[in-house]
A protein has these predicted regions:
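Amidase signature
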Residues: 1-71, 235-426, 434, 461, ...
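Short, well-ordered beta-strand elements within core beta-sheets of diverse protein domains
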Residues: 20-27, 81, 101-106, 217-224, ...
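Enzymes and membrane/adaptor proteins characterized by extended Gly/Ser/Thr/Asp/Glu-rich
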Residues: 74-114
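Short glycine-enriched loops at secondary-structure junctions
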Residues: 79-87, 130-132, 201, 398-400, ...
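Glycine/Thr-rich phosphate-binding loops of Rossmann-like dinucleotide-binding domains
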Residues: 90, 134-136, 186, 277, ...
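A short acidic, glycine-rich active-site loop
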Residues: 101-108, 153-156, 414-426
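Short glycine/serine-rich loop segments
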Residues: 108-240, 393, 433-434, 438-446, ...
Length: 488
């Protein structure tokens, strides 16, 4: 299939970010209905090539956009897509990539707090995006809905688990889309589709009421610009009653940090990893970014938390993370079975999911407690590096460029092949799900025409520093106009 078929003509609205589109609506250049209808037209035109949007809410979206009750928030009339995994909307499907939920016609009975915040900000939800089953692999090829294709080259994956979201934004269907990240699932698809992907600190964006903050997953968006990542975070970073973890507030709205002068920061660099061979193009992107940061006046040094490249530390963490991941899969299968009203069986889920959930059920309470202890020691070991006076860490986002479709899926007799082959793509991202630190992937590299990203990591609670420096890099390299071959 290759590069796909570009759309005829160019949609000027599709070149606006969410902040820019909201400004155009406020100025009267177009109405919320016109904004939403344009997004619907783009989805209908582009999605047959990509399979990014699996549930369409077009009639509801147009009615919402036309309603006098549409909230007059910062994104009034801007269309958005929601990932079909844990971001729930009452009365709408929530299938988490699972055939059993699809076949049962399962719908949610409540809005996630984050979805409520989107609505209060004036966003208009136009549909839900594809995701691998329970978000367990770094590609988006669920049995339930089929593969999502990368708009830069449709033979390749857009990444996962927010691959549907990333493909939709990269092709210009909507300016931003909800995404989640439990091991890299915001940052990996952002890197593979040439987008900005900010993973907030644990407890910054509430997972309530149906999910918890103590795990490794967080939610936010994939988008084209740092100002969108910042301004949408301002709109959604409001705690929900009963949240067990709430990230510290640094007082100043994130959107006011866009374009801020920071003075000279100390930024460490990690180019490689002892666990995998990093592709030369991914290393080259980091070297180029290090040069850009130095040109901006920052001190860029060859330094990183030693635990990131220590064999003993990383092997211990890999085991602990795998335990946590498997237990999470088991809990998710049980939770969704309860909501469906029956116990799920092997025939209800993909082989990899069933195998991983079985592993999770097989761990003892001691195994799980030990994993939490290892992860706590890891958090403290990494935090010490930032406490010693380092402001940011620069790494590749992924070790490899985007894979071809089918490379990260299970094989006959190898149910965990997808998860195992996903690991090199999450080598640089998953450690910061463990620590809960904020990290951002920026589209500052390429490999044979496909995007690759670089990652900046800040201390816990310091998304403001990521916005500061990310926007400085964005001014120096205007990536927002770099468009995929399949784009509106």
């Amino acid at each position: 299939m290759g590069k796909g078929e570009p759309a005829d003509g160019s949609d000027d609205l599709a070149r606006l970010d969410a902040v820019g589109l909201a400004e155009a609506i406020r100025k009267g250049d177009l109405s919320p209905v016109e904004s939403v209808q344009a997004a619907i037209d783009r989805i209908e035109r582009l999605d047959p090539q990509l399979n990014a949007v699996i549930h369409r809410q077009f009639e509801q979206a147009l009615a919402t956009a036309a309603s006098p009750d549409l909230p007059n928030g910062p994104f009034r009339g801007v269309p958005i897509l929601i990932k079909d995994l844990w971001a729930e909307e009452a009365g709408q499907p929530h299938h988490a990539g699972m055939k059993c939920l699809r076949d049962a016609g399962f719908t949610s009975d409540t809005d996630s707090h984050m979805v409520t915040r989107y609505k209060q900000a004036g966003f208009v939800i136009v549909g839900r995006t594809n995701t691998p089953e329970l978000g367990l692999v770094a590609t988006t090829e669920p049995h339930a809905y089929g593969p999502t294709r990368n708009p830069w080259d449709t033979d390749h994956s857009p990444g996962g688990s927010s691959g549907g979201a990333a493909a939709a934004v990269a092709s210009g269907m909507v300016p931003a889309a909800n995404a989640s990240d439990g091991g890299g699932s915001i940052r990996i698809p952002a890197a593979m589709c040439g987008l900005v992907g900010l993973k907030p600190s644990r407890g910054r964006v509430s997972m309530g009421p149906n999910r918890e903050e103590w795990g490794v997953s967080v939610q936010h968006v994939v988008c084209h610009t740092v100002r969108d990542a910042a301004t949408i975070l301002d709109a959604t970073a409001i705690p929900f009653p009963g949240d067990g973890v709430i990230a510290p507030d640094h007082g100043r709205p994130y959107d006011t940090r866009v374009g801020s002068e920071t003075g000279r920061l100390t930024i460490g660099v990690l180019y490689d990893n002892h666990r995998v061979d990093v592709h030369p193009d991914c290393v080259a992107a980091v070297r180029r970014t290090a040069d850009l940061l130095a040109d901006l006046g920052h001190e860029v040094i060859d330094s990183h938390p030693k635990a990131l490249n220590d064999v003993g530390w990383t092997e211990d963490l890999s085991g602990a993370f795998a335990t946590n991941w498997a237990v999470g899969a088991a809990l998710s299968v049980d939770h969704l079975g309860e909501r469906l009203g029956r116990e799920l069986t092997a025939s209800d889920v993909e082989p990899g999911t069933w195998t991983m959930a079985g592993m999770g059920r097989g761990f003892s309470a001691f195994d799980y407690a030990r994993a939490q202890s290892v992860m706590a020691r890891w958090r403290r070991a990494l935090a010490a590096w930032w406490a010693d006076g380092h402001d940011l860490l620069l790494t590749p986002t992924t070790s490899l460029p985007p894979p071809r479709l089918g490379e990260l899926t299970p094989a006959e007799g190898e149910p965990l092949r997808g998860s195992q082959r996903s690991m090199p793509y999450a080598t640089f991202t998953s450690p910061f799900n463990t620590t809960g630190q904020p990290a951002i992937s920026l589209p500052l590299g390429a490999s044979e025409g496909l995007p690759v990203g670089v990652q900046l990591v800040a201390a816990y609670g310091r998304e403001d520093v990521l916005v500061d420096v990310g926007s400085q890099l964005e001014r120096k390299v205007d990536w927002s106009q770099h468009r995929a071959p399949i784009h509106a």
